[in-house]
Amino acid sequence: MSQIMYNYPAMMAHAGDMAGYAGTLQSLGADIASEQAVLSSAWQGDTGITYQGWQTQWNQALEDLVRAYQSMSGTHESNTMAMLARDGAEAAKWGG
Protein backbone atom coordinates (compact mmCIF):
# COMPACT_ATOMS: atom_id res chain seq x y z
CA MET A 1 0.00 0.00 0.00
CA SER A 2 1.43 3.38 -0.94
CA GLN A 3 1.44 6.39 1.34
CA ILE A 4 -0.30 9.66 0.66
CA MET A 5 1.96 12.60 1.41
CA TYR A 6 0.62 16.11 1.99
CA ASN A 7 2.59 19.31 1.60
CA TYR A 8 1.01 21.30 4.42
CA PRO A 9 2.99 24.53 3.90
CA ALA A 10 1.95 24.58 0.23
CA MET A 11 -1.66 23.85 1.19
CA MET A 12 -1.64 26.74 3.68
CA ALA A 13 -0.07 29.01 1.07
CA HIS A 14 -2.85 28.05 -1.31
CA ALA A 15 -5.45 29.00 1.31
CA GLY A 16 -3.68 32.35 1.67
CA ASP A 17 -3.71 32.82 -2.10
CA MET A 18 -7.44 32.15 -2.13
CA ALA A 19 -7.98 34.81 0.53
CA GLY A 20 -5.90 37.20 -1.57
CA TYR A 21 -8.02 36.48 -4.63
CA ALA A 22 -11.13 37.39 -2.65
CA GLY A 23 -9.50 40.72 -1.81
CA THR A 24 -8.57 41.25 -5.45
CA LEU A 25 -12.15 40.59 -6.55
CA GLN A 26 -13.43 43.02 -3.96
CA SER A 27 -10.96 45.69 -5.08
CA LEU A 28 -11.81 45.23 -8.75
CA GLY A 29 -15.49 45.40 -7.89
CA ALA A 30 -14.93 48.72 -6.11
CA ASP A 31 -13.10 50.07 -9.17
CA ILE A 32 -15.92 48.98 -11.45
CA ALA A 33 -18.50 50.47 -9.09
CA SER A 34 -16.79 53.87 -9.21
CA GLU A 35 -16.81 53.79 -13.01
CA GLN A 36 -20.46 52.74 -13.06
CA ALA A 37 -21.40 55.51 -10.65
CA VAL A 38 -20.31 58.06 -13.24
CA LEU A 39 -22.47 56.39 -15.89
CA SER A 40 -25.52 55.92 -13.69
CA SER A 41 -26.05 59.64 -13.22
CA ALA A 42 -26.58 59.98 -16.98
CA TRP A 43 -29.33 57.36 -17.13
CA GLN A 44 -32.82 58.54 -16.31
CA GLY A 45 -36.38 57.32 -16.63
CA ASP A 46 -36.98 53.71 -17.63
CA THR A 47 -33.33 53.28 -18.61
CA GLY A 48 -32.21 54.47 -15.19
CA ILE A 49 -34.64 52.16 -13.42
CA THR A 50 -33.50 49.21 -15.52
CA TYR A 51 -29.88 50.10 -14.87
CA GLN A 52 -30.46 50.25 -11.11
CA GLY A 53 -32.00 46.78 -11.18
CA TRP A 54 -29.01 45.38 -13.04
CA GLN A 55 -26.62 47.22 -10.76
CA THR A 56 -28.29 45.73 -7.70
CA GLN A 57 -27.96 42.24 -9.20
CA TRP A 58 -24.30 42.88 -10.05
CA ASN A 59 -23.51 44.14 -6.55
CA GLN A 60 -25.20 41.15 -4.93
CA ALA A 61 -23.43 38.69 -7.23
CA LEU A 62 -20.05 40.25 -6.48
CA GLU A 63 -20.71 40.17 -2.72
CA ASP A 64 -21.76 36.53 -2.97
CA LEU A 65 -18.65 35.65 -4.99
CA VAL A 66 -16.28 37.36 -2.56
CA ARG A 67 -18.01 35.76 0.43
CA ALA A 68 -17.82 32.33 -1.25
CA TYR A 69 -14.11 32.74 -1.97
CA GLN A 70 -13.49 33.81 1.64
CA SER A 71 -15.47 30.82 2.86
CA MET A 72 -13.56 28.41 0.60
CA SER A 73 -10.27 29.85 1.81
CA GLY A 74 -11.25 29.50 5.45
CA THR A 75 -12.56 25.98 4.93
CA HIS A 76 -9.41 24.92 3.09
CA GLU A 77 -7.23 26.36 5.87
CA SER A 78 -9.34 24.75 8.59
CA ASN A 79 -9.33 21.35 6.88
CA THR A 80 -5.58 21.53 6.29
CA MET A 81 -4.95 22.28 9.96
CA ALA A 82 -7.26 19.43 10.99
CA MET A 83 -5.43 17.03 8.67
CA LEU A 84 -2.07 18.19 10.03
CA ALA A 85 -3.23 17.62 13.61
CA ARG A 86 -4.60 14.18 12.71
CA ASP A 87 -1.34 13.23 11.00
CA GLY A 88 0.59 14.35 14.07
CA ALA A 89 -1.65 12.31 16.37
CA GLU A 90 -1.30 9.22 14.19
CA ALA A 91 2.46 9.64 13.93
CA ALA A 92 2.69 9.91 17.72
CA LYS A 93 0.99 6.52 18.04
CA TRP A 94 3.82 5.01 16.03
CA GLY A 95 6.55 6.91 17.83
CA GLY A 96 7.13 9.31 14.93
Curated annotation (Swiss-Prot):
Family per record: Belongs to the WXG100 family. ESAT-6 subfamily.
Protein name listed in UniProt: ESAT-6-like protein EsxR
Domain notes: In the heterotetrameric form, EsxS adopts a long helical conformation that pairs with a second EsxS monomer in an antiparallel manner that allows the N- and C-termini of two EsxS subunits to interact with an EsxR subunit at each end of the EsxS dimer thus creating a molecule with four-helix bundles at its extremities.
Compartments it resides in: Secreted
Gene Ontology cellular component list: extracellular region; protein-containing complex
Domain of life: Bacteria
Gene this chain is encoded by: esxR
Keywords noted in UniProt: Secreted
Keyword Metal-binding among UniProt keywords: no
Record note on quaternary structure: Forms a tight complex with EsxS. Exists in heterodimeric and heterotetrameric forms.
InterPro entries found in the cross-reference section: ESAT-6-like_sf, T7SS_ESAT-6-like
NCBIfam families in alphabetical order: WXG100_ESAT6 (TIGR03930)
